């Protein structure tokens, strides 16, 4: 017969503090501090569930600061910087190949008269280095970056 296994996973507990303040006409400064408690939220795949979890996510704190500007009734732009401190955890799971990050992002928002918003954004992230050792096999993840982009269409009523 086929082998079967049970997998358990859950999302961490989060605490987030958001702020925003107008700093000039049509200009907004915003930011957040987000803490994630991973201590009881690891991924576990049987038969490892009896020995140790499959993942080794670390508690984390993420800081974001950004500025938004309304250019006209139709156009707005925003830019942000985000950082998550490294945990210095060497790692025992290939599910966690990074340790902290720094990222910059930008977006443009076009608002139609009917309330539809079209947002186009891009984000560049510099991922924290990490060495992972799992069952005698090591993986070194150094100098990795990501570029992500997206388009969102929303209707506000």
Model region roles, listed by residue range:
Residues 1-157:
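Outer-membrane beta-barrel porins/channels
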